[in-house]
């Protein structure tokens, strides 16, 4: 298998036929000879071969190959190279170019020319080793590409470092903003919790005060209940005692009324005897005795009636029992206004209304 070797082309194929674009490095003007000029041409490279001028009629023409780094002295100027004339040279080595020429045809022609001139091939090899360390020529000026590349690399590094710094700064600011927002949220939550705790504490204190007041009220009510219970027991005992006294009084009244009835019967018998005796002439003493008894009975009734009347006003019958002296001595009207017992002058703590109707 045959492997094609790569050949170094110092100029692109497009520059081979563009004779009008070549310029002189000193004057920066197009040369009249095109590629046939011996001077160094512009655009950084020169065609490795030269084309003779079709209008020249002399036998001594320009050498067929001029290297970019070579001069007129590198190639011998003998007439043997142009034995057939310039027209034959153009037909043999330079076919008329088309508007679109393939890269393979250019490479084959260029390789064929290098094989015809070994000295030109050595010049090409020397040029390839020299171009790695020399400055490039572009548009007639020497430009240090490496310095520009280093400057561009420094600019890129500076932009990258600036971008990284800005990214770190933005990241730091975002983190700080996030922390501030978190602190703000925590402070708001803490304030809300503190307010709620304060409200709950105030409510608890208020409920505690209400509970304390209710407990005091319960204690006072229990004491008052105990007082009323004792008073009820006392009143019950007083009522029982008064009931017993009333029963005794009623029994005494019945006894008195029964005695009064017997005395009345006896008086009637005495009256009858007196009538009989008067007729006999001895009834004056009996009449006097009878009158004295009646007067005494009337006085007793008046005394009992007076004792039953109110000791304060004397107009109404006594129906109010005073405690703790237990004297039945006031009427219903005076029982609410008088605070001391009229009989023993002791202070009144309570009073009980007694129904005396039989």
Swiss-Prot record:
Annotated metabolic or biological route of this protein: Protein degradation; proteasomal ubiquitin-dependent pathway
Recorded catalytic activity of this chain's protein: S-ubiquitinyl-[E2 ubiquitin-conjugating enzyme]-L-cysteine + [acceptor protein]-L-lysine = [E2 ubiquitin-conjugating enzyme]-L-cysteine + N(6)-ubiquitinyl-[acceptor protein]-L-lysine
Xref: InterPro entries: Znf_RING (IPR001841), Znf_RING/FYVE/PHD (IPR013083)
Sequence segments annotated as region (WRD domain): 214-250
Effect of gene knockout: No visible phenotype. Decreased resistance to B.cinerea and increased cell death upon pathogen infection. Boi, brg1, brg2 and brg3 quadruple mutant shows a higher GA signaling resulting in a higher seed germination in the presence of paclobutrazol, precocious juvenile-to-adult phase transition and early flowering.
Domain of life, source organism: Eukaryota
EC number(s) recorded for this UniProt protein: 2.3.2.27
Segments forming a coiled coil: 171-234
Zinc finger (RING-type): 310-345
GO biological process: defense response; proteasome-mediated ubiquitin-dependent protein catabolic process; regulation of programmed cell death
Record Pfam families: zf-C3HC4_3 (PF13920)
Induction remark: Down-regulated by pathogen and salicylic acid. Up-regulated by salt, gibberellic acid and methyl jasmonate. Not regulated by 1-aminocyclopropane-1-carboxylic acid (ACC).
Enzyme class: transferase
Database matches in PANTHER family: BOI-RELATED E3 UBIQUITIN-PROTEIN LIGASE 2-RELATED, SBP (S-RIBONUCLEASE BINDING PROTEIN) FAMILY PROTEIN
Role summary: Probable E3 ubiquitin-protein ligase. Has no effect on the stability of the DELLA proteins.
Assembly behavior: Interacts with the DELLA proteins GAI, RGA, RGL1, RGL2 and RGL3.
Protein name, per record: Probable BOI-related E3 ubiquitin-protein ligase 2
Source species of the chain: Arabidopsis thaliana (Mouse-ear cress)
């Amino acid at each position: 298998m045959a492997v094609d070797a790569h050949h170094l082309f110092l100029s692109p194929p497009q520059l081979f036929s563009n004779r009008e674009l070549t310029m002189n490095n000193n004057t920066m003007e197009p040369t009249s000879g095109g590629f046939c000029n011996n001077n160094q041409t512009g655009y950084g490279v020169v065609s490795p071969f030269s084309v003779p001028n079709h209008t020249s009629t002399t036998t001594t023409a320009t050498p067929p190959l001029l290297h970019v780094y070579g001069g007129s002295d590198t190639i011998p100027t003998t007439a043997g190279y142009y034995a057939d004339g310039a027209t034959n040279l153009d037909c043999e080595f330079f076919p008329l170019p088309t508007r679109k020429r393939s890269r393979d045809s250019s490479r084959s022609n260029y390789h064929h020319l290098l094989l015809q001139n070994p000295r030109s091939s050595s010049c090409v090899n020397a040029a390839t080793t020299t171009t790695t360390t020399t400055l490039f020529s572009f548009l007639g000026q020497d430009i240090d590409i490496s310095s520009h590349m280093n400057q561009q690399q420094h600019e890129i590094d500076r932009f990258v470092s600036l971008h990284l710094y800005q990214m770190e700064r933005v990241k730091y600011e975002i983190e700080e903003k996030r922390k501030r927002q978190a602190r703000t949220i925590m402070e708001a939550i803490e304030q809300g919790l503190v307010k709620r705790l304060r409200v709950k504490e105030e409510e608890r204190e208020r409920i505690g005060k209400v509970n304390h007041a209710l407990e005091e009220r319960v204690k006072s009510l229990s004491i008052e209940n105990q007082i009323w219970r004792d008073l009820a027991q006392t009143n019950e005992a007083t009522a029982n005692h008064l009931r017993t006294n009333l029963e005794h009084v009623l029994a005494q009244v019945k006894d008195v009324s029964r005695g009064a009835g017997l005395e009345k019967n006896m008086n009637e018998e005495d009256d009858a005897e007196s009538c009989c005796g008067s007729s006999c002439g001895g009834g004056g003493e009996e009449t006097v005795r009878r009158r004295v008894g009646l007067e005494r009975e009337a006085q007793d009734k008046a005394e009992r009636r007076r004792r039953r009347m109110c000791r304060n006003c004397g107009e109404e019958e006594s129906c109010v029992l005073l405690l703790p002296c237990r004297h039945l001595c006031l009427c219903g009207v005076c029982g609410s206004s008088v605070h001391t017992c009229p009989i023993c002058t002791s202070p009144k703590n309570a009073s009980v209304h007694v129904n005396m109707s039989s």
